[in-house]
């Protein structure tokens, strides 16, 4: 894509630095990936990205698992020599997919995966110059864009600009409300893989433990949605 310019490398014999992500390796090339020129250019590019990024890491869903955060630490960035300017755009917070324009770093990965892999073309570049950002193609609302909610753009976003809507607090509020009956549905993917996140062996991560955990938290009923999940997979 060569949008972020963070992957710059130095090719011996060439005057200009080149992006490694979209240049093919050829026989006989001598490539320097960590030369003084590369380090200076890479640091400046990351600083430019940060100057247009809302880096409230403590409240970001990607904190601790953020490519930009890792790069900033690796390049020893402790201040910004550029004026900070963060763009804001409204978004429907009720939609399952949440986009935070203030955190977008214009890497264009969401555009590429949605267009070339999923074939949907939901995202596109909007505005120009320093106001350039990514938004729904054609200035449409996301609810009118036929988004399949596949989640690929969230997976490929290196920061917290794209994420799933978090309804955790709504769940706790429902459990605390004695007038409500809380019904939990567990998909087969969760049933079979939840133990990995807990560092448990497969034979120890039983369905019964999921049931027990939800009942202890306050759920009234717990069901497996394998049938409806199969239908969803067929539709996708």
What feature does the model see in each segment?
Residues 5-149, 155, 162-163, 167-174, ...:
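Fe-S ferredoxin-like electron-transfer domains
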Residues 1-34, 38, 164-236:
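Iron-sulfur-associated redox domains of electron-transfer enzymes in respiratory
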